[in-house]
């Protein structure tokens, strides 16, 4: 292999290796000139690529403010918006509330006519079973967890929930059996709400208990809209007036929207993805096997995040003008969410075990995520075994050890309690971490991003903000004024335009070394088996949000065509 010398351009650049190029570890470099070149390459990259603190207490980002600084190999082409937005004319300037659900329905019919899942959401969003279904299989399946104890700050009693449990059972027995689940949005406690259209909007930090019934359906049984119990913070129940109960669920869905966008989506996949990408560029030479393995999955994160910070998360962007938590609350939300982040929560088998999701027979996200993780893990292990011939090779790879320390420092902010490794001692430790990186930046991102239009297109199902404060008493809400809590017309349009743009995958993929084709074919084989297994869910109560259907739109092509070189 000839020596490739980087020119002194002013942008960050990576080079895709040709099909007959050599990929190797530093210890395998036999030519002194090549070893010296690796050192020189990394010195040059570290001078060009630096770190920047975007928000104190959150993962760091690349020190670049313009996409033009990235160069052609770290940017990508975006397809046109996925839906026709001409119908928004006449709506985008209306800084007023929706007049009725009928007006919303007319608006939606223009918008959702080609989205069968969105139509299904509109038809069933009021139903308790569908509320529980979304917690498991919607665009944010990362909040639900099994609980064996009622939170001490939730004013729920056994007698209160008795009508919603099996006839011969008690709350204590259901907790012991593992059929009680919890949504807790305490990260929103005390977060100031946004001012939109010169009007104060409102947030809540609800707690919601759900029960897995004998038919296998997960249904909400109690909702408390604020963290601190008291006479002005009642516990809403399914037996309450219909509009009271529906409004309580809408408040939960609004809180979920905030946590989904900033924690599940932006933090876990985008910000951490940027950390993985920046660390890879700074610490791994382009002939390192992990550079070649990881870069197809992470290279677009820099462009996406730079654009997000310059538009979506900037003054006059959608977070400033249309989202309940707003720009002023961004530091609190991201720093709090980062403090709660752990390495275990990013690793699918550990996360599912910790949240007790194996007990949910219709949690298709859990089932699919575990299968995709397992296939990815086998795939990564085979690639690791191609280049590392034992644990000692892992320990002695100084480039690899610098890479993981950089991630620990700038991604997990040197917090030992995060559980992020500071070094790798074994091939299995390395395989697990690399699997996590690929899963987070491909399959997980597909699950929390590409299903947004399915579940958020009917806005009352996932309101981005609320224009009236949470109710402090029961019996004050009617069908006629329920919609008055929802965001204004123009902010609704802003959110939908943004979600439409975010729901479109990148258009280009890379071609890579044919050395890996045999390993990739094994991965494809296990992936196809999984696609077949998801087809047996016709008895499910709703179209499965199945991770794999979403994964095929983004991580499927990315995992498969980029490594085999068979894509467009």
Segments (PLM) and residue ranges:
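Long, compositionally biased charged/polar stretches
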Residues: 1-568
């Amino acid at each position: 292999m000839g020596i490739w010398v980087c020119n002194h351009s002013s942008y960050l650049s990576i080079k895709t290796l040709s099909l007959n190029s050599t990929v190797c570890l530093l210890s395998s470099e036999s030519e002194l000139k090549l070893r010296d070149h690796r050192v020189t390459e990394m010195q040059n990259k570290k001078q060009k690529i630096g770190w920047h603190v975007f928000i104190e207490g959150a993962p760091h980002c690349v020190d670049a403010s313009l996409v033009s600084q990235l160069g052609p190999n770290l940017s990508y082409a975006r397809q046109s918006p996925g839906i026709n937005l001409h119908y928004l004319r006449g709506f985008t300037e209306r800084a007023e509330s929706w007049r009725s659900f009928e007006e919303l329905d007319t608006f939606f019919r223009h918008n959702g006519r080609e989205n069968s899942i969105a139509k299904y959401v509109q038809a069933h969003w009021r139903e308790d079973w569908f509320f529980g279904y979304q917690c498991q299989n919607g665009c944010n399946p990362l909040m639900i967890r099994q609980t064996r104890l009622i939170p001490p700050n939730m004013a729920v009693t056994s007698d209160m929930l008795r009508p919603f449990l099996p006839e011969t059972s008690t709350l204590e027995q259901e907790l012991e059996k593992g059929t009680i689940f919890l949504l807790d949005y305490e990260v929103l406690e005390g977060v100031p709400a946004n001012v939109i259209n010169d009007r104060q909007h409102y947030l809540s930090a609800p707690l919601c208990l759900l029960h897995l019934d004998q038919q296998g359906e997960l249904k909400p049984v109690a909702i408390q809209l604020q963290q601190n119990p008291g006479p002005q913070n009642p516990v809403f129940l399914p037996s309450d007036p219909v509009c009271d109960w529906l409004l309580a669920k809408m408040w939960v869905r609004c809180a979920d929207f905030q946590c989904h966008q900033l924690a599940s989506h932006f933090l876990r996949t985008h910000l951490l993805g940027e950390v993985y990408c920046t660390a890879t560029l700074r610490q791994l030479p382009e002939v390192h096997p992990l550079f070649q393995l990881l870069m197809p999955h992470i290279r677009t994160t820099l462009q996406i995040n730079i654009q997000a910070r310059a538009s979506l998360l900037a003054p006059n962007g959608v977070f400033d003008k249309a989202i309940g938590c707003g720009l002023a609350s961004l530091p609190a939300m991201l720093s709090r969410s980062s403090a709660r982040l752990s390495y275990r929560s990013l690793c699918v088998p550990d996360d599912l075990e910790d949240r007790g999701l194996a007990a949910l027979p219709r949690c298709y996200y859990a089932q699919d995520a575990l299968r995709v993780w397992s296939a990815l893990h086998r795939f990564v292990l085979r690639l690791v075994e191609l280049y590392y011939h034992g644990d000692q090779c892992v320990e002695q790879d100084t480039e690899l050890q610098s890479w993981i320390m950089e991630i620990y420092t700038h991604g997990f902010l040197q917090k030992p309690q995060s559980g992020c490794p500071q070094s790798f001692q074994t091939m299995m430790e390395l395989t697990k971490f690399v699997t996590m990186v690929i899963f987070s930046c491909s399959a997980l991102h597909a699950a929390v991003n590409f299903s947004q239009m399915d579940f958020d297109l009917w806005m009352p199902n996932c309101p981005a903000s609320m224009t009236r404060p949470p109710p402090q008493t029961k019996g004050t809400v009617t069908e006629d004024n329920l919609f008055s809590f929802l965001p204004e017309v123009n902010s609704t349009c802003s959110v939908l335009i943004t979600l439409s743009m975010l729901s479109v995958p990148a258009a280009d993929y890379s071609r890579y070394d044919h050395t890996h084709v045999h390993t990739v074919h094994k991965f494809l084989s296990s992936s196809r088996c999984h696609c077949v297994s998801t087809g047996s869910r016709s008895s499910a109560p709703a179209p499965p949000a199945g991770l794999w259907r979403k994964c095929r739109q983004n991580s499927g092509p990315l995992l498969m065509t980029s490594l085999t070189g068979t894509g467009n």
